[in-house]
Every structure is written in structure tokens, then in C-alpha cells.
Amino acid sequence: MRILLYLVSIVAANVVTAAFAPLTMGMFIVPMGTFLIGATFIFRDLVQNKYGRKKTYMFIGLALLLSAVVSSILGDTLIIVFASELTFAIAETTDTEIYSRLKLSMSLRVLYSGIVGGILDSAIFVVLGLSPLGANFLPWGAVPAAILGQVIVKTIIQGIAALIIHQTNNMSKYTVAS
């Protein structure tokens, strides 16, 4: 089930981003798929927690392939597909390695690895995919707000997930202790 949630969240993020206009909140520009991208880091952490780091890379590879196919079907340009795939590979690998190396509670590993992964995901994709360096959808002046808007949303999602995981783990400890 964890693997399915991980893969479906990636496909859904691509579809939602293509289907809906970005959300504009003041100066911030947030593609609608951003809400699901934050979740992909959490689902990937759950996959890794169950299957281990080595097998998780196999699922990341499958997700990478699936994402490229879906992006191509949706009509994304080659530069967007390339930027998306490179961003995904870097952000997911970084999240995986941080999650693996931290010797903290699961909730804190999810939080910290997800925040770093989210920052990388936001910065790399906006610069390589959306700025004048990429597909030129955003002028350079809008790039910082686009990155920051995505980072804020992804960080909030990571924080909520960390709280839920923390509460769930505390409740299960209490239930076992009773």
C-alpha cells in the first residue's frame, strides 16, 4: 500500500499541475501539484521505513520512469520533462540519504529530510524548468517568490505529517503499555 501511495502521489502531482492553474497568494506562485509533491516525500519515507534504503532506490527509479511517461503524455516540453526528472532524482536521493542517516525519531527524520528535499525540489525545478534558463514561463524577478511559495507549502505539509506520525507513535506506545 505504501508503494502504491508513493507512485500514485507522483502521477497525481503531475496531472494536477498540468490540469490546474497555479495558486497565486500575494507574491507567491504555487503550482497545485506542490501540495502532492510534499506528500511524495512522506510516502517515500514510509516506503523506506518498511523496505529499507536499497529497495527504496528501486521504487524511486520506477517513480522516475512513471513520472517521465506521464509528463510526456500530458504534453510537457522536453525541457520541463528533463528539469522535472533531474529535480526528482536529486530531491528524492537527498531525502532518502538524510532520512537514512539521521538517528532521530521517525517523525523528526520525516520532517528534516522532507524539508531539505522540498527546498531542493522547489529551487532546482523552478530554476531549470520554469525560469528563463528553462522553459521561460517565469521571469527572473518571479523566481524567488515561486521557490519560496513552494518551500512554504511543502514545509507545512512536512510539519503536519511529522505531527501526525509523532502522535500516532505516541498513541501506539501508550496502547502497548496499557
What does each of the following model-derived ranges do?
Residues 43-47, 68-74, 94-98:
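Membrane-helix exit/interface motif
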Residues 13-18, 67-74, 125, 129, ...:
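Structural signal for membrane-spanning alpha-helices in multi-pass inner-membrane proteins
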Residues 47-53, 57, 72-80:
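Transmembrane alpha-helix/helix-exit interface in multi-pass inner-membrane proteins
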Residues 1-54:
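Hydrophobic transmembrane alpha-helices
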Residues 11, 63-65, 88, 118:
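Residue-level recognition of pore/gate-forming positions within transmembrane alpha-helices
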Residues 77-178:
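Membrane-embedded alpha-helical hairpins and interfacial helices in multi-pass inner-membrane proteins
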Residues 21-32, 67-87:
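Interfacial aromatic-anchored transmembrane helix boundaries in multi-pass membrane proteins
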Residues 1-5, 53-63, 105-112:
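Cytoplasmic-side transmembrane-helix entry/capping segments in multi-pass membrane proteins
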